[in-house]
Regions:
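N-terminal compositionally biased, intrinsically disordered segments and leader/signal-like regions
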Residues: 13, 24-25, 34, 50-54, ...
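Bacterial N-terminal signal peptides that target proteins for export
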Residues: 2-13
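Solvent-exposed loop and beta-edge segments used for protein-protein assembly and interaction
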Residues: 42, 71-73, 167-169
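Edge beta-strand at a domain terminus
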Residues: 104-110, 116, 157-192
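Bacterial N-terminal signal peptides
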Residues: 11-21
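Predominantly extracellular/secreted and cell-surface proteins with exposed
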Residues: 45, 59-157
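N-terminal segment immediately downstream of the Sec signal-peptide cleavage site
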Residues: 37-64
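Bacterial Sec-dependent N-terminal signal peptides
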Residues: 2-3, 20-47, 175-192
Length: 192
C-alpha cells in the first residue's frame, strides 16, 4: 500500500515539474505550439477510472492502472494498459456486484503531444492497438453481451486502428479512446 502511495506522490511531483517545464518552454508569442514538445518524465503511472460507453450510455466501469512513457526522443508518449475488466452497469444505473465485462481489454498507443498556453498538454493518437480477449480464455456467451454490441469474433479480436484524444491538466489525465471496431467510446479519467 505504501508503495502505491509513494508512486502516486512521485507522479504528482513529476507532474509539477512537467507543468513548470511547459510554462518555461512557451513561445515568445505565448500561442499554442504547432509542433511536438518534449515530456520531462520517462514513465508515469496513473490510477484511472475506465468507462466504456455506447452513445454516451455507460456500459461498464472500473479502476485500473495505466502507464504513460516517453518515446521518440521524448516528443511522444506511449499510453498503455493491459487486461482491464470492469463491472457492468445494471438496468437501474448501478454497478453490478457480480457481472463483469465479457472481455479483458488491452490498449497500446503512441500519442503526439502538444503544449497549450493554459499549461495543459494535449494528446492525439498517431497509432494504436486495441485488443479484447475473453475472460478465462473461453468464447463469449452471446446472452452475456450488452445490448447493441456484436463483436467481430466471440473468441476475441484486435485492431491497429484505435484512436484517442485527450489532455493532461493540473495532474488530471483525461482521454477518450475509440477502438474503431465497435461503436464504443472509452472514457479514461484520473480524477473521478
Amino acid at each position: 500500500m505504501k508503495i502505491k502511495q509513494f508512486q502516486q506522490m512521485m507522479s504528482m511531483v513529476m507532474m509539477l515539474v512537467l507543468v513548470a517545464f511547459m510554462t518555461t518552454s512557451c513561445s515568445k508569442s505565448d500561442e499554442d505550439t504547432d509542433g511536438l514538445v518534449p515530456i520531462s518524465k520517462e514513465v508515469n503511472f496513473y490510477s484511472v477510472t475506465i468507462t466504456p460507453t455506447i452513445q454516451n450510455q455507460k456500459m461498464a466501469q472500473g479502476t485500473h492502472t495505466v502507464m504513460l512513457e516517453t518515446t521518440n526522443n521524448k516528443k511522444q508518449v506511449r499510453f498503455h494498459f493491459e487486461n482491464f475488466n470492469g463491472r457492468m452497469f445494471e438496468s437501474n444505473g448501478k454497478l453490478s456486484e457480480n457481472q463483469f465485462m465479457p472481455f479483458e481489454v488491452s490498449v497500446d498507443m503512441i500519442l503526439n503531444v502538444t503544449s497549450n498556453k493554459d499549461g495543459s498538454v494535449s494528446f492525439k493518437s498517431e497509432k494504436g492497438t486495441f485488443k479484447a480477449k475473453p475472460k478465462d480464455g473461453k468464447p463469449i456467451d452471446m446472452s452475456k453481451l450488452p445490448e447493441g454490441i456484436l463483436p467481430p469474433n466471440l473468441n476475441g479480436f484486435e485492431t491497429d486502428k484505435a484512436q484517442a484524444e485527450g489532455t493532461l491538466k493540473n495532474g488530471r489525465l483525461y482521454l477518450v479512446l475509440s477502438p474503431m471496431i465497435l461503436p464504443v467510446k472509452i472514457i479514461i479519467d484520473s480524477n473521478n
